[in-house]
């Protein structure tokens, strides 16, 4: 039997965007809008299904352009338009488990703009990822949302 390990982490990120909550929500809910930011840095999406609804399941294969080795399997648990998105996802790399996460996105009006709060509770499996790497990736994606909104 191979030794296994688990490290738990909680990531909390906040962003303020000039766009209103409806537009920020649409960045998650609309496939063309999400395609502009849905992977960190210069990574690419090689394959993706899109089913953004409560109970909807999405599969995405992504990673560096020359090696999109990661697969995220996402289940949407709760969606309140322009206010809240709650989902769980597992991530694998070349078929090996990397992590399992529960993520909450809270949107609230902030003047004419939006405050976005992301909280991700994650179990990192067998040392294949860590909180610092995940936080960097999530922060990059949130920054790309702002760029896509012109905010």
Tell where the protein language model's regions lie, with residue ranges:
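Hydrophobic ligand-binding cavity/cleft-lining segments
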Residues: 1-44
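Intrinsic-disorder/low-complexity, polar/charged segments enriched in Ser/Thr/Lys/Arg/Asp/Glu/Gln
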Residues: 8-14, 21, 45, 57, ...
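Short beta-edge strand/loop motif at the mouth of beta-sheet-based domains
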Residues: 12, 32-69
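Hydrophobic/aromatic beta-strand elements that line small-molecule binding cavities or substrate pockets
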Residues: 15, 47-50, 72-78, 101-108
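A short, structured loop/turn motif at beta-sheet edges
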Residues: 21-22, 51-53, 77-84, 106-115
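Hydrophobic pocket/interface hotspot
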Residues: 24, 34, 58, 76, ...
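Helix-adjacent hinge/juxtasegments
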Residues: 59-81, 87
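Beta-strand/loop substructures that line and gate deep hydrophobic ligand-binding cavities in soluble
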Residues: 88-140
